[in-house]
């Protein structure tokens, strides 16, 4: 039934990788089962043979989906099946997309869809790297005009050594989590998070990862040669040189002048006017011309004008030199009721960032294939349409917003205090209110400021900067703090976040080949200078966390009780703790080791909760006098509550110093009495005496102190 499948197995660091095709999804353009030590991802590629007429963009879609059966689980929820992509799935889809997109040729507009499905997972092997390898292999055997294959590698930094594809366990000890992808001679994509490493260490990790992944590229080339799929008969559309010359004659000089306008919206208005006038003039001359083709040629001319000016050493679009950072404006405490806030403005890019403190109960529970985990630091990025002067749909976050939020979070994570140092869940939200390039890095700066304003004891200020590159043959210019146009028209987007002493996050997307180690080194060094400048301005506004948190934030008080007492504080069916939280207006969390965290915005409420917990957990001591309440009467004596949940018996002979015939003659239920603890037997029963309490009091005996546990 099946033709003989093609299988390629090779060693990749400590892992064994297997690529297999020919058995499953034979109606797809290409399909590969990629396996790395029991983590298996099935990747399909489908390309449409015909492009949509008049389409001027490349419709590539990458879907990444994790099936819970891969980990031997059944999904939660009412429907018991997988739903919309999680944040993690969205991020890995972007990770696959970014290095493959620039390898399709200009002019190729056929629709292509990649679907990567995780079908088996080894908890120690993350599925992202093998998903990228599987995608590369599937594209390599698809026959599509794909200028690959690519390799992918994760790099860790453990005990001063670079480690290829570290396991989940090793990553916990690593100071670096870096993913690099590229072809045999070029790095195309880097995504990383670091514990404040130097620029040299980051670059060494990128080069190491690129060198190591050559084994993957070699194996995929051999795999593709064995499959031997015929290449598609696709020919790049012929260039309309006549129309190109006409557009240049009408627009080039005017575009050069338009790009002297430094204000973004005014420049856009002028360029739009030129485009409309050129299009109208050409259509008046020949009605048969394609408007979309005119616009594409006009856009390409814009790109040429800007790039030529930058390579020539002229001032940039907004008048800056190549290594200048735009004007900065930094403000903190801009919103009165938030726990922390900042407004960070860099040129025409602006972020309003807030920090909110919550309890451990507010932590996000993330249900991953490898297990459940809690995240106590959340960072969300919003990019509303008004920030670029447009109208648009407002709803759930798009892929780009999720990706930018994660990048900003990576930049800040290294300086966040541990839950033990700061027992709060922290949520940061960045609202982009203006955008003209590098809004994710503005979010990093604003987040650092808002956290300090909220009193979160971060280890250092963090700033981010976006770098760009324009390269023509052997000439290149590295640009600091790029504008949106420079990002769009350039060859590289290179974002670096870090403190004054090192890098915390690095993201790189390269659109061309030929980016050398020297160019990356120059970009990193130039980024460091820009970062230090931004940090100096930020430190003038706020250089350390405020000494106290906001009056509107919950204050968390920590106390410790005996593990045996946890059940007493919780009560039967949670009755005691529920009553405590309702009556004191606090939030109470109890950990397995007896640590209790009490959160309240009102200090008196917290004190009352602490007092009551101390009462509940206090131990009865022999020889100590307590003030208790008579709980019930019996013929042989009375039961008295001396501590919450702790009753003792006053025998009829211990009520008074004379003979008592009837208990009710001396006591009533609810009456407060002083009693002395005579004995606690082996079964924990407490024997009390009223008459000895009176005698001891007369002798100036010590009355029972409050229970001992102390709260911080």
From Swiss-Prot:
Taken from the UniProt entry, a GO cellular component term is:
cytosol
Q: Name one GO molecular function term.
A: RNA binding
Q: Which residues bind Mg(2+)?
A: 487, 493
Task: Please give the superkingdom of this protein's source.
Answer: Bacteria
Protein EC: 2.7.7.8
**Which cell locations does it reside in?**
Cytoplasm
The record's annotation in PROSITE patterns points to: KH_TYPE_1, S1
Q: Which cofactor does it need?
A: Mg(2+)
The answer to whether the entry has keyword Isomerase is no
Instruction: List, alphabetically, the CDD domains matched.
Output: KH-I_PNPase (cd02393), RNase_PH_PNPase_1 (cd11363), RNase_PH_PNPase_2 (cd11364), S1_PNPase (cd04472)
What is the recorded function of this protein according to its Swiss-Prot or TrEMBL entry?
Involved in mRNA degradation. Catalyzes the phosphorolysis of single-stranded polyribonucleotides processively in the 3'- to 5'-direction.
Query: Mind telling me what this protein is named?
Result: Polyribonucleotide nucleotidyltransferase
This protein's gene is called: pnp
């Amino acid at each position: 039934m099946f033709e003989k499948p093609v299988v390629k197995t090779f060693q990749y660091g400590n892992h064994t990788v297997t690529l297999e095709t020919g058995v499953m999804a034979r109606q797809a353009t290409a399909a590969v089962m990629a396996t790395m030590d029991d983590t298996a991802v099935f990747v399909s590629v489908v390309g449409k043979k015909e492009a949509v007429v008049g389409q001027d963009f490349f419709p590539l879609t990458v879907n990444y989906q994790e099936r819970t059966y891969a980990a031997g689980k059944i999904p939660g929820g009412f429907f018991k099946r997988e739903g919309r992509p999680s944040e993690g799935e969205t991020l890995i889809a972007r990770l696959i997309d970014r290095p493959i997109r620039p390898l399709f040729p200009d002019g190729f507009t056929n629709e292509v869809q990649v679907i990567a499905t995780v079908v088996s997972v080894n908890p120690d092997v993350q599925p992202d790297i093998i998903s990228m390898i599987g995608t590369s292999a599937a594209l390599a055997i698809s026959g599509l005009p794909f200028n690959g294959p690519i390799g992918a590698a994760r790099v860790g930094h453990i005990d001063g050594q670079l480690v290829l594809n570290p396991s989940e366990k090793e990553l916990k000890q690593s100071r670096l989590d870096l993913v690099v992808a590229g072809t045999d001679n070029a790095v195309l994509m880097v995504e990383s998070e670091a514990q404040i490493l130097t620029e040299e260490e980051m670059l060494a990790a990128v080069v190491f990862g690129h060198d190591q992944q050559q084994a993957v590229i070699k194996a995929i080339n051999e795999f593709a040669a064995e499959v031997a799929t015929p290449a598609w008969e696709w020919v790049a559309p012929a260039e309309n040189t006549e129309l190109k010359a006409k557009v240049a004659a009408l627009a080039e000089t005017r575009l050069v002048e338009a790009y002297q306008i430094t204000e973004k919206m005014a420049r856009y208005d002028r360029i739009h006017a030129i485009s409309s006038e050129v299009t109208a003039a050409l259509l008046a001359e020949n009605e048969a011309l394609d408007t979309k083709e005119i616009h594409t040629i006009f856009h390409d001319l814009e790109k040429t004008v800007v790039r030529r000016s930058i390579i020539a050493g002229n001032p940039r679009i907004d008048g800056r030199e190549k290594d200048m950072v735009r004007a900065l404006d930094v403000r903190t405490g801009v919103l009165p009721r938030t726990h922390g806030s900042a407004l960070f403005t860099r040129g025409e890019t602006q972020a309003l960032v807030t920090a909110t403190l919550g309890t451990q109960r507010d932590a996000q529970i993330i249900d991953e294939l490898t297990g459940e985990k809690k995240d106590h630091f959340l960072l969300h990025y919003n990019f509303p349409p008004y920030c670029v002067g447009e109208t648009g749909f407002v709803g759930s976050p798009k892929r780009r917003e999720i990706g930018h939020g994660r990048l900003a979070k990576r930049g800040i994570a290294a300086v966040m205090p541990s839950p033990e140092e700061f027992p709060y869940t922290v949520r940061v939200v960045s609202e982009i209110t203006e955008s003209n390039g590098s809004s994710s890095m503005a979010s990093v700066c604003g987040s650092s400021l808002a956290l300090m304003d909220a009193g979160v004891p971060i280890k250092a200020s963090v700033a981010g900067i976006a770098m760009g590159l324009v390269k023509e043959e052997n000439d290149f210019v590295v640009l600091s703090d790029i504008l949106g146009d420079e990002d769009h028209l350039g060859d590289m987007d290179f974002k670096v976040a870090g403190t004054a002493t090192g890098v915390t996050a690095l993201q790189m997307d390269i659109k061309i080949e030929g980016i050398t180690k020297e160019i990356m080194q120059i970009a990193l060094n130039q980024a460091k200078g820009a970062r230090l400048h931004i940090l100096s301005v930020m430190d003038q506004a706020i250089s350390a966390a405020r000494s106290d948190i906001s009056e509107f934030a919950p204050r968390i008080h920590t106390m410790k009780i005996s593990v045996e007492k946890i059940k007493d504080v919780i009560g039967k069916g949670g009755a005691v703790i529920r009553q405590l939280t309702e009556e004191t207006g606090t939030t109470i969390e109890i950990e397995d080791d007896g640590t209790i965290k009490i959160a309240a915005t009102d200090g008196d409420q917290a004190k009352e909760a602490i007092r009551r917990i101390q009462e509940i957990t206090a131990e009865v001591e022999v020889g100590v006098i307590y003030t208790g309440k008579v709980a019930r009467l019996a013929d042989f004596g009375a039961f008295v509550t001396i501590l919450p949940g702790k009753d003792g018996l006053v025998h009829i002979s211990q009520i008074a110093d004379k003979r008592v015939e009837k208990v009710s003659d001396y006591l009533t239920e609810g009456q407060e009495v002083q009693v002395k603890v005579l004995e606690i037997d082996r079964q924990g029963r407490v024997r009390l005496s009223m008459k000895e309490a009176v005698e001891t009091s007369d002798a100036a005996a010590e009355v029972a102190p409050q229970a001992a546990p102390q709260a911080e």
